Amino acid sequence: MKFRIIYSFLSATLLLPFLGYAQQWGPPDLQVEEESYEKQDDPYLPNAYNNQKLSPAYRYDGRSGSRTSNTEIFTRQVNVSPSHKNILGDAANEPSIAVNPLNESEIVIGWRQFDNVNSNFRQAGWGYSSDGGQTWTFPGAIDPGVFHSDPVLDYDNAGNFYYNSLASQHPTEEYPCYVYKSGDAGVSWNNGVYMGGGDKQWMTIDRSGGMGEGNIYSSWTSYYSHCPPGFFTRSTDGGNSFDSCSILPEDMYWGTQAVGINGELYISGRSIVPGRILVAKSVDAQNPARSPTWTSVSTVELGGYIVYRPDVNPEGI
């Protein structure tokens, strides 16, 4: 299946036809969509054509049509064969991208890799580029044959890449997450470090240059946690180990994190109360000698209600 990337100068956007969330003006039912979680259903199936049936990969070169700029734009397919052809019979979605701050020609993308479109068994697929996205290498999957989902990539200021992924060794094992580290621009990864984790996890890395430089923060859905009741963790040693899971001051799910210029940590997510988006702040999560405390929790009004799986696109992919 074709999986492509568009570049304009040094910015990157991955285009895939999926939409998981939407806003509506009327309040939805007061419920948490607990059916939305990752679990192993189908068995693994190898590619039906042994990755030998190929077609031309997607490729585009052009310029923007803006009246105020004349910017070069190019598109390249990422999940390609060694001969840079499209592989028939596989599929990919939920991409996450990271760029090396020390060398912007080095780019890594991770995604959910389906080797066979007749099975929803997914793996931790990835590809890397060393020439700014012009050409790509697709080695396959981290942990081949192991169920993975929810890929999240980030990088630190030293040029290391990190791949956070839910991983289950067998169908009854649900929601454990591991963080994999690459020191060679995505060519290879370590064996991964268990971080606790859970469904719909996200990750960010402190690049503020302060006390928390290199800290890794992650949170996930509380009611699908591998270490209940916790749904937050932190690494202060570059992903070599992670703190015991802890709770946040409010139950936030489908969330993300961000680090401020002074190293303060923000976590945002949807509340179980319709129409509420919450933001929690910690100023001491950056301090490796302290357990994070949370100084404030704010409610953000978006002028509507976030709903999941709207009629326009009920599957979200």
Can you say where each PLM-predicted feature lies in the sequence?
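C-terminal PAP-associated
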Residues: Q23-I317
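Bacterial Sec-dependent N-terminal signal peptides
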Residues: M1-G26
